[in-house]
């Protein structure tokens, strides 16, 4: 039980608010601008996350396929996230041991634009039962529901997740 409580995904309320508790079984790395690695709970500035990151799957093999979802559960703001969740990106059919560029982008990358407070931006990786299990994109980016999407597309529980914090940059902080 002790290890669950110290899990950064539990502390960051990703587990609970976005997905149910799961045991990671695959390693996923997310890197912006080839040098900014995403670590759970660390802060990145909006100016450094404008272009899509490299998301690598360190697991499975070329015959296994994964779906990656990026969401913001803190819209419009973390104190009253009544628009939860906002969908930022979905890539499906990513072969194991490769990265998102080898998959099929069904929802294009949308850069984080947090207006109120500190937002969490969450990357979730799901293992597909087979290729082309996720065929249709959600109708809207607004009020996306990761649990429901995973259920509708038979994705099961996530196999990996990582999140970063991001807040609006003020002119003073940019200097």
UniProtKB/Swiss-Prot annotation:
Domain of life: Eukaryota
Keyword presence, Iron: no
Keyword field: Cytoplasm
Biological process, per Gene Ontology: negative regulation of flower development; vegetative to reproductive phase transition of meristem
Location in the cell: Cytoplasm
Xref: Pfam families: PBP
Sections of the chain in a coiled coil: none
InterPro entries given in the database record: PEBP, PEBP-like_sf, PEBP_euk, Phosphatidylethanolamine-bd_CS
Induction context: Down-regulated at the onset of flowering.
GO CC annotations, alphabetized: cytoplasm; nucleus
CDD domains in UniProt: PEBP_euk
Tissues expressing this chain: Expressed in vegetative axillary meristems but not in the main shoot meristem.
Cysteine disulfide links: none
Function per UniProt: May form complexes with phosphorylated ligands by interfering with kinases and their effectors.
Family: Belongs to the phosphatidylethanolamine-binding protein family.
Protein name stated in the entry: CEN-like protein 2
Gene name for this UniProt entry: CET2
């Amino acid at each position: 039980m002790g290890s669950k409580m110290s899990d950064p995904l539990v502390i960051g309320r990703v587990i609970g608010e976005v997905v149910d508790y799961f045991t990671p079984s695959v390693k996923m790395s997310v890197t912006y601008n080839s040098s900014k690695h995403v670590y759970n709970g660390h802060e990145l500035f909006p100016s450094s996350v404008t272009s899509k990151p490299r998301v690598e799957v360190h697991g499975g093999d070329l015959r296994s396929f994964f779906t990656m979802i990026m969401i913001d559960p803190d819209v419009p703001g973390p104190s009253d996230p009544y628009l939860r969740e906002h969908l930022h990106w979905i890539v499906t059919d990513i072969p194991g041991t490769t990265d998102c560029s080898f998959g099929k982008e069904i929802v294009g990358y949308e850069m984080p634009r947090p207006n109120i407070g500190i937002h969490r931006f969450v990357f979730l990786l799901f293992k597909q039962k087979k290729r082309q299990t996720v065929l249709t994109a959600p109708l809207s980016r607004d009020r996306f529901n990761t649990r429901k999407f995973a259920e509708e597309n038979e994705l099961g529980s996530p196999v990996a997740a990582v999140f970063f914090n991001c807040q609006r940059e003020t002119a003073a902080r940019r200097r």
